[in-house]
């Protein structure tokens, strides 16, 4: 698993929002100001079309903790078929590391990857060590219960509002019901198509 040396709070400040690295309370405590990272905290100015495309791409990559090579590969896989912003988000939301995080079995996508790589996650009752594995509707996901004990104090209420997942949290069990059809970033279809022109 690759590591990022930059601090997560800098990513959030750069994008101007919480990228789910922190709880809202902790994010407000850490962010302190709306200034972007820099020597003197440069304020945001007018963004060009290219800058908007770049910021959109960076935000998606940071949100799902993926790197340029992997993102580019995903982009061209999706572009072979009819492509729109929902297709891209659906693809990323189907990743096993993301679903483990959505189930609140981990406090971050990075921790999800650790759980998966160390063999503590099962898909349809078979061990799966591939964080980028794409789930299909009806897939059953289970996790080694010993890793749930430290999660009881975590904000479990988030999962109650995710209608495309079924979760029995304290049994370490969940089902991927359907595709999310969520547009988390209000993406413009034409803007996304221009990323790798």
Swiss-Prot record:
Domain (S4 RNA-binding) ranges: 94-158
An individual GO BP term: ribosomal small subunit biogenesis
SUPFAM superfamilies, A to Z: Alpha-L RNA-binding motif
InterPro entries: Ribosomal_uS4, Ribosomal_uS4_CS, Ribosomal_uS4_N, S4_RNA-bd, S4_RNA-bd_sf
UniProt KW NAD keyword: no
Similarity comment text for this entry: Belongs to the universal ribosomal protein uS4 family.
Name used for this protein in its record: Small ribosomal subunit protein uS4
The organism of origin for this protein: Carsonella ruddii (strain PV)
């Amino acid at each position: 698993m690759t590591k990022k040396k930059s601090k997560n709070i800098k990513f959030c400040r750069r994008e101007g929002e919480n990228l789910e690295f922190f709880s809202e309370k902790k994010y407000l405590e850490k962010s302190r100001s709306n200034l972007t990272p820099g020597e003197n905290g440069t304020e945001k100015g007018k963004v060009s079309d290219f800058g908007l495309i770049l910021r959109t791409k960076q935000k998606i990559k940071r949100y799902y903790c993926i790197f340029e090579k992997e993102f580019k590969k995903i982009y061209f896989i999706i572009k072979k078929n009819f492509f729109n912003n929902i297709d891209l988000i659906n693809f990323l939301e189907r990743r096993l590391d993301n679903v483990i995080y959505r189930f609140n079995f981990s406090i971050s996508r990075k921790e999800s990857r650790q759980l998966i790589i160390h063999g503590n996650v099962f898909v349809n009752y078979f061990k799966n060590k591939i964080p980028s594995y794409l789930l299909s509707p009806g897939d059953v996901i289970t996790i080694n219960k010993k890793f749930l004990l430290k999660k009881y104090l975590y904000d479990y209420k988030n999962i109650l509002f995710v209608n495309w997942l079924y979760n029995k949290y304290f049994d370490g069990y969940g089902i991927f019901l359907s595709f999310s059809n969520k547009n988390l970033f209000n993406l413009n279809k034409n803007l996304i198509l221009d990323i790798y022109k």
